[in-house]
Amino acid sequence: MTKSELIERIVTHQGLLSSKDVELAIKTMLEQMSQCLATGDRIEIRGFGSFSLHYRAPRVGRNPKTGQSVSLEGKFVPHFKPGKELRDRVNEEDEAEA
């Protein structure tokens, strides 16, 4: 699902909000979440999951075209850990489809 598809679904489901209002709310939420992670903070949405940063240590990688070794610097990467309610819901829907 893309951001525009999410906006469409919310507008259709909600009915009271315009697509511009929903678009602004989603863009604002994503921007605030990005800023929060950029400063090293953790985001927790109970029942859904949490976003945090994980550190990837420096390592030696390979250039896939040449096979040459390349030194990769350490970096922080965003990490999402689903909450129990989200995991349970996903597993319920998987079992219903099987």
Curated annotation (Swiss-Prot):
The keyword Transmembrane helix does not apply. This is Integration host factor subunit beta. It comes from the Bacteria. Heterodimer of an alpha and a beta chain. InterPro entries: Hist_DNA-bd, Histone-like_DNA-bd_CS, IHF-like_DNA-bd_dom_sf, IHF_beta. Belongs to the bacterial histone-like protein family. It comes from Pseudomonas putida (strain ATCC 700007 / DSM 6899 / JCM 31910 / BCRC 17059 / LMG 24140 / F1). Keywords: DNA recombination, DNA-binding, Transcription, Transcription regulation, Translation regulation. One of its GO terms (molecular function) is DNA binding. GO terms for cellular component: chromosome; cytosol. GO terms for biological process: DNA recombination; regulation of DNA-templated transcription; regulation of translation. It holds the Pfam family Bac_DNA_binding. NCBIfam families: hip, PRK00199.1. This protein is one of the two subunits of integration host factor, a specific DNA-binding protein that functions in genetic recombination as well as in transcriptional and translational control.
